[in-house]
């Protein structure tokens, strides 16, 4: 049948951890612990969506971070430096990720609605397997149980922005065509992942990394501040190539209905 058969969902900022705070704060702590180098939370957010080693590498290439590194060590960050920061990052992230495992508002109901339509739920993450092995059962205790999940270090080909994790979900879920899949993510590398896999892509402008607010802060934010942050996030996600941008996963069923109508007319991603 010419309709959406599966959605492939990101984790932090998409289905759990409103604002994607679990990984960002840990990057700040890992830089400090490994080398006593300060980075800001805003800087930590810039490469979000990549695998965590690649994320650290990208942070080291940010001009402001590189300038601080050069001032302290007289050189740019090396692969060995990245390894050391990653080694500090991993135990911190494994210890903290369970604290950020609660599903974002609307996720459980949305998943139930999608499954009622016969849609399978795949997922993938920039987290490595060691972190996912803590996060997945913790999220399950809160009621979120995707049909499949893939970690960023599971596949020899690599992670985002390549298509491989998304395509591994297609294989595992037995989906007949990538055009019948939707990749949902709150960060640009995850949108690129979906596009590279030949899928429809939906960006989340409020629940995730680009908006960058806690749920409590979002609830008390002025309409003007919400609008400014939403526009900032949406512009980045559209620039990455997202077919649609909505606030959160709660808005996905309406988007899927729209995509199904386009598929019925013979359109493809």
From Swiss-Prot:
Cofactor binding note from Swiss-Prot or TrEMBL: Binds 1 Mg(2+) ion per subunit.
Active site (record annotation): 10, 52
Residues that bind Mg(2+): 10, 12, 186
EC number: 3.11.1.1
Pfam families hit by this protein: Hydrolase (PF00702)
GO cellular component: cytosol
Cofactor annotation: Mg(2+)
Keyword list, A-Z: Hydrolase, Magnesium, Metal-binding, Schiff base
One GO BP annotation of this record: organic phosphonate catabolic process
Enzyme class: hydrolase
Record field: catalytic activity: phosphonoacetaldehyde + H2O = acetaldehyde + phosphate + H(+)
Any GO MF annotation of the entry: phosphonoacetaldehyde hydrolase activity
Family: Belongs to the HAD-like hydrolase superfamily. PhnX family.
Function: Involved in phosphonate degradation.
Entry-linked NCBIfam families: HAD-SF-IA-v3, phosphonatase
Subunit: Homodimer.
Protein name: Phosphonoacetaldehyde hydrolase
Species assigned in the record: Salmonella paratyphi B (strain ATCC BAA-1250 / SPB7)
Lineage: Bacteria, Pseudomonadati, Pseudomonadota, Gammaproteobacteria, Enterobacterales
